[in-house]
Protein backbone atom coordinates (compact mmCIF):
# COMPACT_ATOMS: atom_id res chain seq x y z
CA UNK A 1 0.00 0.00 0.00
CA UNK A 2 2.73 2.49 0.81
CA UNK A 3 4.85 1.26 -2.11
CA UNK A 4 4.05 3.19 -5.31
CA UNK A 5 2.43 1.00 -7.92
CA UNK A 6 1.72 3.69 -10.49
CA UNK A 7 4.97 3.30 -12.41
CA UNK A 8 4.53 3.40 -16.20
CA UNK A 9 6.22 0.44 -17.90
CA UNK A 10 6.78 -0.34 -21.57
CA UNK A 11 6.26 -3.79 -23.06
CA UNK A 12 7.47 -2.52 -26.44
CA UNK A 13 7.14 0.65 -28.52
CA UNK A 14 3.41 0.09 -28.96
CA UNK A 15 2.26 -0.97 -25.48
CA UNK A 16 2.65 0.92 -22.20
CA UNK A 17 0.94 -0.01 -18.94
CA UNK A 18 0.71 0.70 -15.24
CA UNK A 19 -1.13 -0.61 -12.21
CA UNK A 20 -2.94 1.85 -9.94
CA UNK A 21 -4.77 1.40 -6.63
CA UNK A 22 -8.34 0.16 -6.92
CA UNK A 23 -9.17 1.06 -3.30
CA UNK A 24 -10.98 -2.25 -2.80
CA UNK A 25 -8.60 -4.48 -0.83
CA UNK A 26 -4.96 -4.40 0.24
CA UNK A 27 -2.94 -4.69 -2.96
CA UNK A 28 -6.00 -4.37 -5.22
CA UNK A 29 -5.14 -2.70 -8.51
CA UNK A 30 -6.57 -1.51 -11.80
CA UNK A 31 -4.63 -1.96 -15.04
CA UNK A 32 -4.19 0.95 -17.44
CA UNK A 33 -3.01 0.19 -20.97
CA UNK A 34 -1.95 2.62 -23.69
CA UNK A 35 -1.74 1.02 -27.11
CA UNK A 36 -0.16 2.96 -29.96
CA UNK A 37 -1.84 2.26 -33.29
CA UNK A 38 0.05 2.23 -36.63
CA UNK A 39 -1.06 5.84 -37.26
CA UNK A 40 0.55 6.81 -33.88
CA UNK A 41 -2.80 7.57 -32.21
CA UNK A 42 -3.25 5.95 -28.80
CA UNK A 43 -6.01 3.87 -27.28
CA UNK A 44 -6.31 4.16 -23.49
CA UNK A 45 -7.91 1.09 -21.92
CA UNK A 46 -8.60 0.52 -18.20
CA UNK A 47 -9.47 -2.81 -16.60
CA UNK A 48 -10.64 -3.14 -13.02
CA UNK A 49 -12.27 -5.80 -10.94
CA UNK A 50 -13.99 -4.42 -7.85
CA UNK A 51 -13.28 -0.80 -6.98
CA UNK A 52 -13.51 0.64 -3.51
CA UNK A 53 -15.59 3.65 -2.62
CA UNK A 54 -13.55 6.69 -1.71
CA UNK A 55 -16.38 7.64 0.67
CA UNK A 56 -15.95 4.43 2.68
CA UNK A 57 -12.18 4.09 2.37
CA UNK A 58 -11.44 5.56 5.79
CA UNK A 59 -13.31 2.63 7.36
CA UNK A 60 -11.26 -0.02 5.58
CA UNK A 61 -8.07 -0.92 7.36
CA UNK A 62 -4.83 -0.66 5.40
CA UNK A 63 -6.45 -0.04 1.99
CA UNK A 64 -5.05 2.94 0.10
CA UNK A 65 -7.59 5.24 -1.58
CA UNK A 66 -8.58 4.50 -5.14
CA UNK A 67 -6.48 6.32 -7.70
CA UNK A 68 -8.30 8.48 -10.21
CA UNK A 69 -8.28 7.29 -13.80
CA UNK A 70 -7.77 9.86 -16.50
CA UNK A 71 -10.15 9.86 -19.46
CA UNK A 72 -9.97 6.56 -21.30
CA UNK A 73 -11.38 5.11 -24.51
CA UNK A 74 -12.51 1.83 -22.93
CA UNK A 75 -13.27 0.93 -19.33
CA UNK A 76 -13.82 -2.75 -18.49
CA UNK A 77 -15.03 -3.66 -15.02
CA UNK A 78 -17.06 -6.18 -13.13
CA UNK A 79 -20.57 -5.06 -12.26
CA UNK A 80 -21.31 -6.40 -8.79
CA UNK A 81 -23.87 -3.73 -7.99
CA UNK A 82 -24.39 -2.33 -11.50
CA UNK A 83 -26.73 0.62 -11.22
CA UNK A 84 -27.93 0.12 -7.66
CA UNK A 85 -27.63 3.00 -5.22
CA UNK A 86 -24.96 2.34 -2.62
CA UNK A 87 -24.10 5.77 -1.40
CA UNK A 88 -23.93 7.03 2.15
CA UNK A 89 -22.42 9.95 3.94
CA UNK A 90 -19.46 9.88 6.29
CA UNK A 91 -21.88 10.71 9.11
CA UNK A 92 -24.08 7.71 8.23
CA UNK A 93 -21.05 5.41 8.10
CA UNK A 94 -19.90 6.58 11.54
CA UNK A 95 -23.41 6.15 12.95
CA UNK A 96 -23.61 2.65 11.45
CA UNK A 97 -20.38 1.61 13.17
CA UNK A 98 -21.48 3.08 16.51
CA UNK A 99 -24.76 1.18 16.22
CA UNK A 100 -22.87 -2.03 15.41
CA UNK A 101 -20.56 -1.49 18.40
CA UNK A 102 -23.57 -1.01 20.68
CA UNK A 103 -25.44 -4.04 19.30
CA UNK A 104 -22.40 -6.30 19.69
CA UNK A 105 -22.03 -5.20 23.32
CA UNK A 106 -25.76 -5.74 24.00
CA UNK A 107 -25.66 -9.27 22.58
CA UNK A 108 -22.50 -10.28 24.38
CA UNK A 109 -23.57 -8.79 27.72
CA UNK A 110 -26.83 -10.74 27.51
CA UNK A 111 -24.87 -14.00 27.18
CA UNK A 112 -25.37 -14.47 23.46
CA UNK A 113 -22.70 -15.40 20.95
CA UNK A 114 -22.10 -13.73 17.61
CA UNK A 115 -20.93 -15.35 14.39
CA UNK A 116 -19.49 -13.19 11.62
CA UNK A 117 -19.16 -14.88 8.27
CA UNK A 118 -16.45 -13.16 6.25
CA UNK A 119 -14.08 -13.64 3.37
CA UNK A 120 -10.60 -14.69 4.54
CA UNK A 121 -9.08 -11.79 2.62
CA UNK A 122 -10.02 -8.21 3.37
CA UNK A 123 -13.29 -8.55 5.27
CA UNK A 124 -11.87 -10.75 8.01
CA UNK A 125 -9.00 -8.35 8.64
CA UNK A 126 -11.45 -5.42 8.76
CA UNK A 127 -13.65 -7.24 11.28
CA UNK A 128 -10.87 -8.27 13.67
CA UNK A 129 -9.29 -4.80 13.49
CA UNK A 130 -12.65 -3.16 14.12
CA UNK A 131 -13.35 -5.46 17.10
CA UNK A 132 -9.89 -4.74 18.48
CA UNK A 133 -10.39 -0.98 18.10
CA UNK A 134 -13.88 -1.19 19.63
CA UNK A 135 -13.10 -3.46 22.57
CA UNK A 136 -9.35 -4.09 22.86
CA UNK A 137 -9.04 -1.93 25.97
CA UNK A 138 -12.51 -2.60 27.40
CA UNK A 139 -12.37 -4.36 30.78
CA UNK A 140 -15.75 -6.11 30.29
CA UNK A 141 -14.47 -7.66 27.04
CA UNK A 142 -11.17 -9.09 28.36
CA UNK A 143 -12.43 -12.67 28.76
CA UNK A 144 -14.47 -12.88 25.56
CA UNK A 145 -12.73 -14.92 22.87
CA UNK A 146 -12.72 -13.78 19.26
CA UNK A 147 -12.28 -17.02 17.35
CA UNK A 148 -11.24 -16.99 13.73
CA UNK A 149 -11.20 -20.23 11.81
CA UNK A 150 -9.49 -21.34 8.67
CA UNK A 151 -6.13 -22.34 7.28
CA UNK A 152 -6.20 -19.71 4.55
CA UNK A 153 -6.67 -16.78 6.91
CA UNK A 154 -3.44 -17.61 8.77
CA UNK A 155 -1.50 -17.38 5.49
CA UNK A 156 -3.28 -14.18 4.50
CA UNK A 157 -2.62 -12.57 7.88
CA UNK A 158 1.08 -13.46 7.49
CA UNK A 159 1.03 -11.89 4.03
CA UNK A 160 -0.50 -8.72 5.49
CA UNK A 161 2.43 -8.50 7.92
CA UNK A 162 4.87 -8.92 5.03
CA UNK A 163 3.25 -6.09 3.03
CA UNK A 164 2.29 -3.56 5.70
CA UNK A 165 4.82 -1.04 6.98
CA UNK A 166 5.19 1.41 9.85
CA UNK A 167 2.16 2.22 11.99
CA UNK A 168 -0.14 0.00 9.91
CA UNK A 169 2.09 -3.03 10.48
CA UNK A 170 2.41 -2.23 14.19
CA UNK A 171 -1.38 -1.92 14.51
CA UNK A 172 -2.04 -5.20 12.72
CA UNK A 173 0.60 -6.95 14.84
CA UNK A 174 -1.17 -5.68 17.98
CA UNK A 175 -4.46 -7.03 16.61
CA UNK A 176 -2.93 -10.46 15.92
CA UNK A 177 -1.29 -10.50 19.37
CA UNK A 178 -4.53 -9.51 21.11
CA UNK A 179 -5.12 -12.01 23.92
CA UNK A 180 -8.80 -12.33 22.94
CA UNK A 181 -7.95 -13.47 19.41
CA UNK A 182 -7.89 -17.25 19.00
CA UNK A 183 -6.86 -18.63 15.61
CA UNK A 184 -7.55 -22.15 14.40
CA UNK A 185 -4.60 -22.76 12.07
CA UNK A 186 -5.57 -26.23 10.87
CA UNK A 187 -8.62 -28.42 10.63
CA UNK A 188 -7.84 -30.53 13.71
CA UNK A 189 -10.88 -30.69 15.94
CA UNK A 190 -13.21 -28.87 13.56
What are these regions (language model features)?
Residues 99-190:
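Hard-cation-handling environments
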Residues 1-126, 132-140:
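His/Asp/Glu-rich metal-coordinating catalytic cores
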